[in-house]
């Protein structure tokens, strides 16, 4: 099946080589990796975490863990879809990333199993905006990225969806089945998002200052 272009006004899109030369593209690839991993690290382990922490059956664990996670993640995306045009996307993503870090800490460090499960649900809300938000920021920053860019973003997100739970599982196994330590190891992914967002903001500020200096020198 043909891959149709997604460029404004039907203009020519960037080639894969041109896209890969853009540093900002790799920044968004890292963000997609972090978004996918931050989401799936908790969602894939939430049921087992509920069973282990609360001593409940798998059915109850699925309801207490993944369902609460998914419900709040869906709520966050509903809010973004309905009122996203009124929100400052970058501030919302940074706030969500920091909330995700806090949720990971609650899951891993709070001794009360019920509060840890609340952390799982809050994590679902915090990651809701990260994947679609990165797509939106990427399309705004690289308007000629086209279909190839979105395909690579999705690939990076899928790699994160695999890498996050894998890392958590490996650490859990090394730590004699301590799932909290596995989740704590996964905190590197929301922290990666925070760093990328802060770096991107500073990068744009530096570019804006350089442009202002150029305009003054020609004035």
Please state what every model-predicted region is.
Residues 2-28:
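Juxtamembrane intracellular "pre-TM" segments in multi-pass secondary transporters
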Residues 22-67, 71-74:
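Extracytoplasmic gate region of multi-pass secondary transporters
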Residues 76-88, 172:
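Helix-to-loop junctions at the C-terminal end of transmembrane segments
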Residues 91-106:
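Structural signature of the two symmetry-related core transmembrane helices
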Residues 129-142:
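Intracellular juxtamembrane helix-capping segments at the cytosolic ends
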Residues 143-175:
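A late C-terminal transmembrane helix in Major Facilitator Superfamily
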Residues 170-189:
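A membrane-interface helix-boundary motif in multi-pass transporters
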Residues 185-219:
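Multi-pass alpha-helical transporter architecture, strongest
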